[in-house]
């Protein structure tokens, strides 16, 4: 029988980031749990708006093994209604004290593309990470995160790996020149890659992003590239999500951003066990 090369396991970049003066080791993959304080994010299971629901979701994310809670107050799904920065900030101002009280040790990431919101959530509410899904489109974002000194997640909207590497190289250089130390790269699955094909092409070569020598975050949870390919609904997309998260881990992901924390934590444990017990 002919040998089939399914691709070697690629270990994540050995990297630490500074969170609240503590070094967070990303050489062993971590899980980031999604909390959307919105009425219209694409997966209903992540939406919470009342005080009790926010508290319960925070407890659930941490209890299932996530180190990071990613809080979004503006839906980025393609057909969502636009939300102004003021309303986005009002939602976050309500939710963040509840989350911090419920889980004081959790690392809180803010999913926003507004520099003004990045500043306020860090300075007024003690947010730990800024997660920017618009690749620094706000001209004040890079200077703001560099001044704040918080880790920054830079998500690509490029359609292919070639353009992504060119853009990332330029953007990282700009951030470094401003003094930004901790940068995490997100290939941006579901953003500008097409519904299915472009996303799978990118996933197949994702390990090549390690040339940037920066940690990689993958947010692939329950996205259209799963349910459109399989002919199922978003609610039925957990199995596909777990498969893709496992592939992402084997291609060097440092952080998995997910709606369903426990399956992702289990995927991390299984891949890590395989690495630890691999034949030398």
Feature map (PLM): residue ranges:
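Active-site-adjacent loop and "lid" segments of alpha/beta metabolic enzymes
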Residues: 3-9, 19-20, 26, 42-60, ...
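N-terminal glycine-rich anion-binding loops that anchor highly charged ligand groups
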Residues: 26-37, 60-72
